A protein has these predicted regions:
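Basic- and hydrophobic-enriched, low-structure N-terminal and domain-boundary segments
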Residues: 1-22
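P-loop NTPase motor domains
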Residues: 1-7, 37, 42, 52-69, ...
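Walker A/P-loop nucleotide-binding motif
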Residues: 25-26
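Hydrophobic positions on the alpha1 helix immediately C-terminal to the Walker A/P-loop
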Residues: 32
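Conserved lysine of the Walker
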Residues: 29
Length: 263
């Protein structure tokens, strides 16, 4: 605190849950944040985080490297993080699984809406895109083949052949049709919205970002602390999409555990 007065914050044993650290560049924000991370690890609470480093130098990267196999620092632009990989909810009871799955679906729907709409400002179209994505996600996640592929991927684990068959964005986009969604009343706005989803997602899949967002994840789920880095992205739209994917990876990891620290 100012004037040399210490401030005691306990995120793990009191009902605080959140902390905001602000400061100018080089003021020690990351060092202070790292203290919370170490306390979480001491309490067997996994840590996930996003690190936006414009220079490529990172306090978090240096600290995580000192942890050896217990920590992992991933540059999300040099690997793949499957946007449609759900959290691993097998440790939870049915009610908690459903609650956490709904949280994940809500985030993915918002991420897909952002991809589909880009910089277009059209409230009516955005609303219809959102509604169709909700429906498409429900149909997709209830499809027997999709369910089987997800279950097999999690049963056999990361790096298994079954993991390479986990559903991804190209599988989802095939469900974004009038027939798959069983749209009996089909207005021009529906046609426009589906075309917007298909064209924007299709363009993404054809770009260099496609491999980073639409393939099975190449990041191990094992380390107790994982940071997803965003660096070297100069294009504003690319940076935005990669930030969405890094955020999705953090949300996925956080939802997979009863308690977690998200930095």
């Amino acid at each position: 605190g100012r004037g040399g007065k210490p401030v005691y914050i306990d995120l793990f044993h009191q009902q605080i849950g959140r902390a905001l650290i602000t400061g100018t560049s080089g003021s020690g924000k990351s060092v202070l944040g790292w203290r919370f991370a170490l306390e979480a690890l001491a309490n067997n609470i996994p840590v996930v985080g996003m690190d936006i480093s414009s220079s490529g130098n990172s306090t978090f990267k240096t600290a995580i490297e000192l942890l050896g196999d217990q920590g992992a620092y991933y540059d999300i632009s040099s690997g793949s993080s499957n946007l449609l990989e759900p959290p691993d909810l097998r440790r939870f009871d049915k009610l908690e699984r459903e609650r956490r799955m709904e949280s994940w679906k809500d985030f993915i729907r918002r991420a897909l809406s952002a991809i589909a709409m880009g910089k277009i400002h059209n409230p009516h179209l955005a609303q219809r895109v959102d509604a169709l994505l909700i429906r498409a996600l429900d149909v997709f996640l209830r499809d027997p083949e999709i369910i089987t592929r997800y279950n097999r991927a999690f049963e056999m684990g990361w790096r298994s052949p079954e993991w390479q068959q986990i559903p991804t964005l190209p599988n989802f986009i095939k469900f974004c049709t009038r027939e798959s969604l069983n749209l009996r009343s089909f207005e021009d706005l529906d046609r426009h919205a589906l075309n917007q989803i298909q064209s924007q997602v299709g363009a993404l899949l054809a770009s260099r970002l496609g491999k980073a967002i639409a393939r099975p994840s190449t990041f191990s789920p094992e380390p107790a602390i994982k940071f997803f880095a965003l660096s070297g992205l100069t294009n504003e739209q690319d940076a935005y999409l990669m930030a969405i994917n890094a955020h999705a990876a953090c949300i996925r990891n956080a939802l997979s555990h009863p308690r977690s620290l998200f930095i």
